[in-house]
Amino acid sequence: MCAPLEKDDIRRLSQAFHRFGIVTVTELIEPHTRKLVRAEADRLLDQYAERRDLRLATTDYTRRSMSVVPSETIAANSELVTGLYAHRELLAPLEAIAGERLHPCPKADEEFLITRQEQRGDTHGWHWGDFSFALIWVLQAPPIDVGGLLQCVPHTTWDKASPQINRYLVENPIDTYHFESGDVYFLRTDTTLHRTIPLREDTTRIILNMTWAGERDLSRKLAADDRWWDNAEVSAARAIKD
């Protein structure tokens, strides 16, 4: 499933992760495993995809336009994804990179998410994650000139009552990343403001997100009604009509 990494590789990845909030770990995952995950995501999208088009109050009304397969649907219908999520062969190197233990996500609706951006303008707008760590499998990526690139501002914090996203964008550099189909990256989601650049034309960008918690997350109280991927009718969401 996973290819072993040398100590020097782990050290290099860990240093980059703590500096930039993100590292590419494609070399950690065997190509055969990545192909299996791609086929599994396609199957789940074909059977269970739900469309979302909304703006979210807790991130200054940034946009969410994509199709999704929610976490609990994935958990109930994919032994492959749930098995990978709990596999020590995957968790051990990620924990070495993070420098701490990765705990199963304490909220079942946030363990997993499959998204498919497919229409011109589709985007996952500026946001943070409620929990500390995510492994993102880029299963299908558009060409670099079409959009869908990842942008990040590390070492930021999320105040849901006053996100101040534009202030962060003005006061900090924005790092931009292009990934090819099959790439995998590890992201510090709670302190890295991030988004995907909107698609310039109809095309396809598919990812699988696996989320883990840090020790600090286990006692957190999440009061905001903003879990849009699980329910498009949450109170923090404003539907996009156009």
Curated annotation (Swiss-Prot):
It catalyses: L-lysine + chloride + 2-oxoglutarate + O2 + H(+) = 4-chloro-L-lysine + succinate + CO2 + H2O. One of its GO terms (molecular function) is L-lysine 4-chlorinase activity. Gene3D superfamilies: q2cbj1_9rhob like domain. It holds the Pfam family HalD. Coiled coil: none annotated. One of its GO terms (biological process) is L-propargylglycine biosynthetic process. Keywords: Amino-acid biosynthesis, Antibiotic biosynthesis, Iron, Oxidoreductase, Plasmid. Pathway: Amino-acid metabolism; Antibiotic biosynthesis. It is an enzyme of class 1 (oxidoreductase). Its EC number is 1.14.20.-. Its cofactor is Fe(2+). The keyword Oxidoreductase applies. It comes from the Bacteria. Disruption phenotype: Cells lacking this gene no longer produce detectable amounts of L-propargylglycine and L-beta-ethynylserine, that are terminal alkyne-containing amino acids produced by wild-type S.cattleya. The keyword Calcium does not apply. NCBIfam families: Lys_halognase_BesD (NF042920). Belongs to the alpha-ketoglutarate/Fe-dependent halogenase family. Involved in the biosynthesis of terminal alkyne-containing amino acids such as L-propargylglycine (Pra) and L-beta-ethynylserine, that are produced as antibiotics by S.cattleya. Catalyzes the chlorination of L-lysine at the C4 position, leading to the production of 4-chloro-L-lysine. This is L-lysine 4-chlorinase. It comes from Streptantibioticus cattleyicolor (strain ATCC 35852 / DSM 46488 / JCM 4925 / NBRC 14057 / NRRL 8057) (Streptomyces cattleya). The gene is besD.
